[in-house]
Every structure is written in C-alpha cells, then in structure tokens.
C-alpha cells in the first residue's frame, strides 16, 4: 500500500532533480524549509521528527539537498518529507509538504470495527507495521 500524504503524493516518487526544482520554488517564495522523518506515518500523525534545525534564511538549494541526503542516510527505512513554512504575516503556516523518501515495503493500514452499546459502532485506523515491530524497527 502506497502512503499518500502531502503534495504530489499520487504521482510517482520525485527524482532529486524534481525535488531541487520544488526547493528552488520555495526559496524563491521566501519560505523556510525543513526535513522531517518518521517510521509511523499514521494519517493523524501530523508531527514527524524534525531532522536537524529548520533551514531559515537558507538561499542555497545545495544546503537543503545536503540535509536531505544526510536524513536519507540515517533514516533509510523510514519516511522523509520536506516542508515549506511561510512566516509572512497572515499566513504563518506550513504551505507545502511532500514525501521525498519512503521504505521499499509499505505494509499499510487496516480498519478495526468495534461495536458498543446501543448499536454504537466506532472505527479505528490501525497500522500493520506497529503491530509487528517496536518503534524504530518497523521497516
């Protein structure tokens, strides 16, 4: 199952050249970049681990790509995404986010149904990877 979160998630994986073009676009807009990673990409897990420090005031694409390269080396079996943050007045939010690296095997999710009193039914999204392995060794 292919995880689809963020921009470009329904497209094939971006090449490094395509990632560089997206970074250039973000830098041209004046947005700060950062790299995040996780081994638990649950749809409600919006807070991934920050790789290094946010790249404020970086105007060099190579610096951002270096941080991405280091994250790929260290977190090869996890998910890595790039975020762009617009700090301008009135926005002050993440304006672009896209996955740049993913594990070779993505086990996916399943829906667990629980029946309660009075025909009350709840559904919970569960991860196959969390059931099988402890945190840090899921992929």
Swiss-Prot record:
What does this protein's UniProt record list under function? RuBisCO catalyzes two reactions: the carboxylation of D-ribulose 1,5-bisphosphate, the primary event in carbon dioxide fixation, as well as the oxidative fragmentation of the pentose substrate in the photorespiration process. Both reactions occur simultaneously and in competition at the same active site. Although the small subunit is not catalytic it is essential for maximal activity.
Swiss-Prot/TrEMBL keywords? Calvin cycle, Carbon dioxide fixation, Chloroplast, Photorespiration, Photosynthesis, Plastid
Q: Which InterPro entries match?
A: RuBisCO_ssu, RuBisCO_ssu_dom, RuBisCO_ssu_sf
Name this polypeptide is given: Ribulose bisphosphate carboxylase small subunit
The family database entries (SUPFAM superfamilies) matched by this protein are listed as: RuBisCO, small subunit
On whether Transferase is a keyword of this UniProt record, the answer is: no
What GO CC terms are in its UniProt record? chloroplast
Which family does the UniProt entry place this protein in?
Belongs to the RuBisCO small chain family.
Q: Which GO terms describe its biological process?
A: reductive pentose-phosphate cycle
What species is given as this protein's source? Answer: Trieres chinensis
Pfam families named in the record: RuBisCO_small (PF00101)
Q: What is the lineage of its organism?
A: Eukaryota, Sar, Stramenopiles, Ochrophyta, Bacillariophyta
GO MF terms listed in the record are:
ribulose-bisphosphate carboxylase activity
Q: What else is known?
A: In this alga, in contrast to plants, the small subunit is encoded in the chloroplast. The basic functional RuBisCO is composed of a large chain homodimer in a 'head-to-tail' conformation. In form I RuBisCO this homodimer is arranged in a barrel-like tetramer with the small subunits forming a tetrameric 'cap' on each end of the 'barrel'.
User: Subunit comment for this entry?
Assistant: Heterohexadecamer of 8 large and 8 small subunits.
Instruction: Identify the gene encoding this protein.
Output: rbcS
Q: HAMAP family of this UniProt entry?
A: RuBisCO_S_bact
Q: Does the record carry Iron-sulfur as a key word?
A: no
Q: Where in the cell is it found?
A: Plastid, Chloroplast
């Amino acid at each position: 199952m292919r995880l689809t979160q963020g921009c470009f998630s329904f497209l094939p994986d971006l090449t490094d050249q395509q990632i560089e073009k997206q970074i250039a676009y973000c830098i041209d807009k004046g947005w700060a970049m950062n790299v995040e990673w996780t081994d638990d990409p649950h749809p409600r897990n919006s807070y991934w681990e920050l790789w290094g420090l946010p790249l404020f005031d970086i105007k060099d694409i190579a610096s951002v790509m270096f941080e991405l390269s280091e994250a790929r080396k260290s977190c090869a079996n996890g998910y890595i995404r790039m975020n762009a943050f617009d700090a301008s007045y009135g926005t002050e939010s993440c304006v672009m986010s896209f996955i740049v690296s993913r594990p070779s095997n993505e086990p996916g999710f399943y829906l667990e149904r629980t029946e309660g009193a009075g025909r009350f039914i709840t559904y919970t999204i569960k991860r196959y990877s969390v059931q099988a392995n402890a945190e840090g060794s899921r992929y």
